[in-house]
């Protein structure tokens, strides 16, 4: 009976006693943590049906294992019930002591987090204030001392300036400066015309407002400088505008300006194109030399192709330059000069852009870094450049000779041009003497010098009057009465013939004609 009553009493006493596990689970911190775990577990189960089935299987397994463990441990628990009761009481007392010492155990997690955040922020704020407040106070003191020193220095400077201005020398200097500035202002007002906008406005201000105090010297000087600069700019702009309008009335200036603009744009295009083409060939040439040492056969084939390409490029450039130099001369002296200047500018720009590549290629050839094709291409470009410059010089000379009349003696004409005068033809002699044949004495010898024209024309005195009376008496009247005829048309060997103004072909045109023939 005693054995049967024991468990009944034990079962009756358990609900009345406090359980440590229940109290721990009832704590807000523990309950909130359990709720978080439960929510996480439920969300994981709902993520996928397969996960939910696996979790349900594990739950059933754990539940069955716990039931089996409780059924197997029941006899042991009944025998050790007194010891478990004593341990439960001790645990409850310790839990009461912890709740008294740590009241945060009774708070929810949200309140604990907010209080923790507040305490951390207050600690950080206090630490920051402990560091920043001394620095701020020190900086304020330093700034205050600096400002006080600056104010003291400014005050001393003002007092010194006022004292110097109140002295006799200062008053004389200020009066002289005021007088000089006033005279300059009067001269400027007298010489410069008043502004259209400022004149009526100044009159209105005088009628409406009372006279103000006299401005300082610095303000007056700045106003005078602004007035002079503004008037200078206006005068310069007006002069430029008038000059432009007058220059446009001159015949030939408008096309010259358009040609200058076109030449500038063409020069910029040429410079940009040449800058894009010019490259620094050091690394490429070094790599090419290394490749040549490894593969000689492939290099020979590549050299042949490169030579052909370079020859084509050089021929194209020469054709372009020849076309530039072979352009027809425009009508008029101004057009010819402008055309020549444009051609010279183009060739100069091309020479300047080719010079770096030519110098680098020559240096690389000396240092055995560049192959022979680079030297040949550079040489070809140099030759084409020299030909272009020669063509330009020939064009300039032709233009000058064509439009500038030079004296006859300055042009070294050969003796062949005067042979027609020294040695007249038989038809001319027949016309001069009528139907009579010319006597052998009156015709000059083939080797006769230029001075023998006097004897032919009958201007020199006879050397032997006894012998020449018969011939002179018959020939002199008819020869003197004959008018001088113009010589036949001759082709001169010099640059131009003074009698007829005609353009002469340059070297580039002659070379093109030879090629075409």
From Swiss-Prot:
- Listed InterPro entries: Perilipin (IPR004279), PLIN1 (IPR042998)
List Phosphothreonine occurrences by residue.
85, 223, 298, 300
Q: Which UniProt keywords apply?
A: Endoplasmic reticulum, Lipid droplet, Lipid metabolism, Phosphoprotein
Which of the residues bear the PTM Phosphoserine? Answer: 81, 126, 130, 132, 137, 174, 314, 384, 386, 410, 433, 439, 460, 492, 494
Q: How is it modified after translation?
A: Major cAMP-dependent protein kinase-substrate in adipocytes, also dephosphorylated by PP1. When phosphorylated, may be maximally sensitive to HSL and when unphosphorylated, may play a role in the inhibition of lipolysis, by acting as a barrier in lipid droplet.
Renumbered to this chain, the Acidic residues biased-composition regions fall at 298-318
> What are the start and end residues of every segment in region (Required for interaction with CIDEC)?
290-321
Q: State its location(s).
A: Endoplasmic reticulum; Lipid droplet
One term under GO cellular component: cytosol
The ranges of region (Disordered) come to: 195-216, 286-320, 425-490
Which Gene Ontology biological process is one annotated for this entry? lipid catabolic process
The record's subunit annotation is:
Interacts with ABHD5. Interacts with CIDEC. Interacts with AQP7.
The record's similarity note reads: Belongs to the perilipin family.
What is the documented function of this protein? Modulator of adipocyte lipid metabolism. Coats lipid storage droplets to protect them from breakdown by hormone-sensitive lipase (HSL). Its absence may result in leanness. Plays a role in unilocular lipid droplet formation by activating CIDEC. Their interaction promotes lipid droplet enlargement and directional net neutral lipid transfer. May modulate lipolysis and triglyceride levels.
Stated name of the protein: Perilipin-1
In its UniProt entry, the species of origin is given as Mus musculus
